[in-house]
């Protein structure tokens, strides 16, 4: 959501509570990003909720997940869609790029998120993509199923728009719930994409938590890290080291 030069850089599950206190960072003279106060956020409750809600997406056919993602991608490529307008408006100040560059990046990224592209991806990766949904016979004596982690924690840093959405999509294809911190320069697309997915299907409003926090000042506690299945990190060596340590 954006109003008067302020972008709310968070999308939390329906049942979670957003702290009343919000932090804000100015990314330009007339634009700021607002996000939940990290210390006030009940992270244990949020992680517990995402884990519990994972059953909803685990029962969703991967073809339906791909279709929903594809529809959002189409919206981002539709020059008359308000979602595209908002994405471009927020990308410019947050990533520090020109309007022309924002359009070029959005067009290139969105083309990789279409239903056709993602269907081809899973067909390349898996001989039978249905292994993402259930056990499939691979020979006369064996069956196989691909089972993603219950909760995926993705931590990003930097200013490359779209990286977070690609990571989010790959986790969704494995039917993981996702807790994501995008980099400040990449807050626009992951947050807006998560919101748009929630409009496509309520399942995504249960299993996605995408919000910014200042990774240099606030670190995820070890007890929280121990509850997630996998941690995916993008950024500098120092950024990744801060998570490991």
Provide a role label for each language-model segment:
Residues 1-144:
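N-terminal Rossmann-like NAD(P)+-binding subdomain of aldehyde/semialdehyde dehydrogenases
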Residues 60, 64, 188, 238:
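Conserved active-site and cofactor/substrate-binding residues in soluble primary-metabolism enzymes
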Residues 65, 175, 231:
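Residue-level signal for inorganic ion chemistry
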Residues 71, 192, 196, 242:
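Alpha-helical scaffold segments in soluble metabolic enzymes
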Residues 118-200:
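Conserved small-residue-rich beta-alpha loop and adjacent elements
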Residues 201-245:
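Conserved NAD(P)+-binding/catalytic subdomain of aldehyde/semialdehyde dehydrogenases
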């Amino acid at each position: 959501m954006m109003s008067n030069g302020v972008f709310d850089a968070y999308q939390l599950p329906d049942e979670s509570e957003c702290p009343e206190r919000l932090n804000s960072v100015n990314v330009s003279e007339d634009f700021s990003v607002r996000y939940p106060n990290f210390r006030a956020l009940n992270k244990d409750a949020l992680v517990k909720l995402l884990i519990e809600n994972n059953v909803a997406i685990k029962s969703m056919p991967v073809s339906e997940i791909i279709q929903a993602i594809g529809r959002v991608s189409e919206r981002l490529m539709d020059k008359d869609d308000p979602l595209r307008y908002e994405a471009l408006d927020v990308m410019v100040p947050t990533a520090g790029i020109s309007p022309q560059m924002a359009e070029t990046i959005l067009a290139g990224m969105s083309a990789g998120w279409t239903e056709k592209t993602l269907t081809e991806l899973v067909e390349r990766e898996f001989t039978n993509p249905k292994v993402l949904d259930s056990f499939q016979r691979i020979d006369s004596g064996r069956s196989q199923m691909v089972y993603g982690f219950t909760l995926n924690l993705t931590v990003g840093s930097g200013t490359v728009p779209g990286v977070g959405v690609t990571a989010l999509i790959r986790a969704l294809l494995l039917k993981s719930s996702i807790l994501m911190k995008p980099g400040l320069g990449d807050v626009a697309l992951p947050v807006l994409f998560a919101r748009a997915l929630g409009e496509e299907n309520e399942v995504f409003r249960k299993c996605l938590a995408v919000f910014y926090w200042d990774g240099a000042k606030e670190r995820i506690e070890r007890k929280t890290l121990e509850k997630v299945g996998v941690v995916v990190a993008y950024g500098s060596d120092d950024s990744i080291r801060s998570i490991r340590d």
